[in-house]
Amino acid sequence: MTLQVSPAWASDPGPSNALPGQDTATPVLVEGIREPVDAKAAPADAARQHLAANKSRYRIPRAGSDLVPLAATATGSTDETVRLQQKHRGVPVLGGQYVVRMQKQDGKRVVTGTSGHYFTALSTDVTPQVTEDVAVRRAVAATARRLGAALDKGQAPRSESGDPAATGMTGEAKGLVVLPKGAGVLAYRVTVRGTAPGTGAPVVDEVYVDARSGYPALQYSALKTMAAPAVPAAGEVAESPTADGPPAAPANLVPETGSGARLSGAAASLDIAYDPAAGSYLLADAGRMRSTSKSLLSTWDARGKSVSETSGRWPSGITMFSSPNTTFGAAATDSGAVDAHWNAGQVYDFYKKNLGRDSLDGNGGAVNSLVGVTYYGMPYANAFWDGTKMVYGIGDKEFKPMSADTDVVGHEMTHGVIEHTANLVYAGQSGALNEALADYFGNAIDVTANGTPMGDPTAGLIGEDLCRTKAAADCALRDLNDGATTSKSFLGVSFATDNGGVHLNSTIFSGALWDMREDLGGALADKIVYKAVTEYMTPIDGFTEARGAVLAAAKALGATAGQQNVVKRSFNAHGIVPGWEQALGVDTDTLFGKLNTTDSGVGAGGGWWTASKSNDDGSEPYSVYAGRLDGKGAPKVISPNDGRYHTAPATDGKTVVWTAYGPTSVDVLSRPVAGGPIKTLYSSVTGVAGLRVEKNTVVFEEYDIIGGRHVGYLRPTDKAPVFTDGKKWNTLTALPSISDNKIAYAKLYPEAGSYRLGVEVVDLATGKAVMTEQLDEPVSLGQTGINGKNVFWLSDTDESDGGLTSVISSGLDGRGAFIVSSEHKPGAFVASDLTVSQDALTLVAQTPDTRYRNESLPKLWQLTTDGSRRERVSCNRGEQSYPAAGAGRQVTWLDATTGSTDLVVRERPAGTC
């Protein structure tokens, strides 16, 4: 997020030991001070008094009212750290946290430094114009779009009255927040939970809906996973009821020592408890926190429970692992329970003994681990922290249960530590920092608990002990010694891909920290990183701010000049230096830079492009622009500046059409490229997508209130849209395209007591509709494309192959279907979008891979219409999305390589990369 700078304040640099913030008047880091403050006041009051007394430095005009205490912690006998939450006119500011560090000794207290983000340019009004119900509905719809546009058999309607959970998701409003963009954007925070259509994967999204227009301005997944491997789709499986919290622990537990075998074969001594009432022994450590909070470290039997039942909730009837004696046998070993329990104890001890932290929350809170979790009864090889507990998958043929490796358990539990301290937002650079810190401490705990030397070749590997047959290097999920740097490794992606690169880019930062640990040793390095996380970092820090936090923490801990140089050298070696984002190169021509938009695509036709853009700091609602594909001339504004979000435009070179998000409706608007009046073509209370235009005929799809999708079209003579499916409750149509007065779309329709998928072509001149031939029975259909000769579409006929997709084509009469690219042959794509010209078709596609990396990101591939040739459109390093075909082989798209989203173009494919 970028901020509005205040020129008058920015001209005053402040003290030499203050590091200026980016586009804000408040410094992000102040160190090297010892300024007296009231020793008798509460820590939070003393901290705010210091900020108020130094307005010329901090530029915080109302510290007493605009900064609300979040937490005050003491370290050792003298150090105090206070975290303060910024509020704007009483509304919390996302990422607005400021930290004040103090020392108190001999009846005196001094401030030693500050850090964080306070946004000085906020001026937005905090009165919403959108109702909470509208915000929730649009958040759920936005999440459904994020999860994929394909029309899937799993979306088949069940009843005419509608299923309230037809989308598989529900939203819960969590109140208003201010997004710190420019003058600020007032938004509803909505948490969307449920399961992904088609796959059933767990969904927990945080969606921030603009409270004036109702547009989803920010969105990311809140599930902090160990990795993001592809999982096969599964059929429906009945779930057990769920509860909001864990069952009550038995009373009068007696601490005992037990034993069990780890999955590695090593014997483990286990801290357990005897339950006198049941006469059995539990994997409940009642000893570690017995003298303080009396909380438990508990390991729960979640075998037979699906991941969707455990994400953000507790399966009803779940119990702790138990045994009739102190020896826990094969069931506890094979499920990963022994490993989870032993490893959780190691993590607790590491934080307690080495860093003085009592449990994940720092206050002796309970630690809960669920093991044996499946993917709807199928193997599940992942693990995650859901905000309250650790959840470990049962594994699969190659991967053991995910609790089998100490670094995985350390990683997930460290997410809990971060959530209770820096609380780094799990998206973009701050999310990559979250992952990097979890990896660093996970590995630090692993090598400490298992006695692995730092010089061991496996010391920097994450998850290397999870595999049953693969060697450590081949098994590892990540490698902190992979040499990743910002200049050669940073991958620009949208929040729709890996939450903005939280795993993709994490080893750039974790690698620097690991280098530092190798050179300084664990005793000092771990303290430096921990101090940086708990006392310096704040929720939306990026790599540069985090570098400053680590350097400041090293200095505060008394690191020598030589040791501080080691820290600097470690970051420099990984390219983490101020301004590193400017050093990334591309092989494309930029038509329109730094769009700062979310979930808004691109249109092209007749030699023109159209796209939406916000202002430089992303605070303004989007406007629609149009320009020439040859780059000549300046882009022109097409949409009005009326407070609505103008998004997802399309053009044929004569007319631009787009959607406008307002407080009560989503409107379809149009305007000639040459200028003229803006027309409102249609208003929807639910939502519109997939706009296309040709000679003033517009085609789109509309969502209904129960999650259904219906394709409609408007000809110049039509007073209202004609819906191809009549908006029947039992028929869905989606993903339209238009060419030569014909439209094509995917269709899900009832037949012989079941549902079938097909692609239908309608001749708008005659009204005749034909269903194209199907070469196999698809379970999912993707985007259609049509030109003057053929119709093309994406098809998936095998839901067990990880999303591999075929490209199918047929004649406009529905006959002569053939496979352009097969999902069953080597080199098959995982395709998500398609655009066609007369000469070529271009896909957004991923190639199957076992881990996230540049090669497996969404990239543009261009195929000849007969499939005889396939080439990469661009070798840019980063995500490529929303392609729109120009003439011949020309393509324009949104490219995220540089870390911002740019509209770029190529006249022909790059070929082989």
Regions found by a protein language model. Give the residues of each.
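Residue position within the beta-strands of beta-propeller blades
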Residues: G607-S614, V656-T659, V698-E702, I743-K747, ...
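Multi-bladed beta-propeller domains
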Residues: Q582-L595, D630-G643, V673-G687, P716-L732, ...
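Structural motif
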Residues: N615-G627, P663-P672, E701-R715, K747-V761, ...
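Extracellular zinc-dependent metalloprotease catalytic-domain scaffold
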Residues: G168-A173, V177-K181, R189-V204, A211, ...
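Segments that shape or occlude catalytic/ligand-binding pockets
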Residues: P7-E236, T242, G365-W385, L757
